[in-house]
Amino acid sequence: MPSFHYDSPATDEQWQAYYQFRWQQLRRPFGLALGTERDALEDQAYHRICLTEDNSIIGIGRIHYETIKAQQLSARIRYMAVAAEFQGLGIGRELVTQLVADARKRGVADCYLHAREEACGFYQALGFELKEGIQSELDHPHFLMQMRLD
């Protein structure tokens, strides 16, 4: 079995590779332009990557934090992707585990995400509850999923 390690992007080269991977996996298949893989919360978010022995990125995930209901902190996982040839090896599960651990460390009450229809079973197996169908900016079926952390 190949060897992987997990980290946060640190160098300019890693950040560039991170955003390129994100676009290739999550935006290009929908015909979206380079640049659509970023949003206004990048600097505030906690980013994780999975790398091969030669430091190629094969998995990514991000979590950012929101204040809701006056002081209650909520977390949203976004931009989860694992290269097709590495799916089923536990990489996505480990990325989500690390993101949720960061949320717990910050005392977050709940964590949510918008999952593509084909990913709902994956997130349910990790403890997320399916809430409702939602409209996504990609015009592709997505579902609101939530996990209570307290």
Regions found by a protein language model. Give the residues of each.
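Short acidic/glycine-enriched loop/turn segments that link adjacent beta-strands
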Residues: 42-44, 71, 137-141
